[in-house]
Structures are given as structure tokens and as C-alpha cells.
Amino acid sequence: MSGNKEEEDPRIHGIKTKIRVVPDFPKKGIMFQDITTVLLDPKAFKDTIDLFVERYRDKNISVVAGIEARGFLFGPPIALAIGAKFVPLRKPKKLPGETIFEEYELEYGNDRLEMHIGAVEAGDRALVVDDLIATGGTLCAAINLLERVGAEVVECACVIELPELKGRQRLKGKPLCMLVEYR
């Protein structure tokens, strides 16, 4: 596991073999990296969580922010294991009560991430979790949202990186930890 490149940890190889590639989903020309097949294998799922926990357990992370939807699969078990709170970053109008939001650009239009006001406080040390980084737009929005309330974003963690889309370059200099790189 690395900020830059896959290492030879046999657990990473096991995780990589469980990721299903679905051609032409959700549209023609996309090679969709499906992590749901990792969840079907208890060992691969546990190894995924364990690798992140080993990396973050001694970094004084106080909040794990998971990006909807697949960040919700990996974020909560990481948060529990390292003794941090879990904060869901959701699509618009999915959270009850008062929220704060950050807009970001998509290929065709805009979207936004929301979180509850008061869920993250100034001085919190945050880890942002998602399943995959492609263009980096969603992770960048998450970083901006957390920093706006005074949190320190320590790192972003993703199971998969698609490096040819250069998403890492949009992360405002924040480190990215990924397990599997697809070219």
C-alpha cells in the first residue's frame, strides 16, 4: 500500500484479483471497476480494511469522512477500528437537518456534497475515504468542505486509482493512499 505505487503485499494482490471490471458501464467506453465483488469475499474485504487501519491507527485521525455511496462501505469499519467518528458526505438533499455543502463540476453539469453542520469541527484531523479516484473532483470537493469548517485533511484513501485521469493532481497537495492502480 502506498501513496504512489502498489507494493508487493500479498493482501493487495488478493484484493486486486477480486475487483471485477465491467465493460461499457455505466456507458459505452467505460471500464467500470466494481468493488462489490471485494465485499463478497470476506478475506479480501477484511484485508482491505486491515491495510487502511494499519496505516491510520497511529495518525490521530479524529474523523473519517466517507463519500457517498461506496465510501460508506469502507469508511465506517476503518473509523471504528481507529477510534474515530464517521461522517457521511452525501449527495444533495439526503441528510435531514442543517447541512453545509460544496459544489463540484462533473463531465456534464455540477453536483455537490453535503454534511451536517457541526459533524466536523475546527481542529479535527480528517481522513477522506472513497472506493476509487478517477478525475479527483469528488475528493477535491470533500477536502474543500472539510477545510471550510476548519478540519485538517490528513490524507485521502481509495481502494482503486485510475492514474491516467490525473485525479491525484486535483487534491490540493493532499496525500493519496490507494491499494490498487489500474492503467
Swiss-Prot record:
What's an example GO BP annotation here?
Answer: AMP salvage
- Job of this protein: Catalyzes a salvage reaction resulting in the formation of AMP, that is energically less costly than de novo synthesis. May contribute to the recycling of adenine into adenylate nucleotides and the inactivation of cytokinins by phosphoribosylation. Possesses low activity toward adenine and cytokinins.
Q: How does activity depend on pH?
A: Optimum pH is 7.4-7.5.
Question: What name does this protein carry?
Answer: Adenine phosphoribosyltransferase 3
What EC number(s) does the entry state?
Answer: 2.4.2.7
Q: What class of enzyme is it?
A: transferase
Reactions accelerated catalytically = AMP + diphosphate = 5-phospho-alpha-D-ribose 1-diphosphate + adenine
- State the oligomer form and interacting partners: Homodimer.
Q: Which NCBIfam families match?
A: apt (TIGR01090), PRK02304.1-3 (NF002634), PRK02304.1-5 (NF002636)
Keywords, A to Z? Answer: Cytoplasm, Glycosyltransferase, Purine salvage, Transferase
A single GO cellular-component term from the record reads: cytosol
Report the source organism: Arabidopsis thaliana
Q: What's the gene?
A: APT3
Q: Which pathway?
A: Purine metabolism; AMP biosynthesis via salvage pathway; AMP from adenine: step 1/1
Is the keyword Cytoplasm in the record?
A: yes
Knocked-out gene: effects: No visible phenotype under normal growth conditions.
Family of the protein in this entry: Belongs to the purine/pyrimidine phosphoribosyltransferase family.
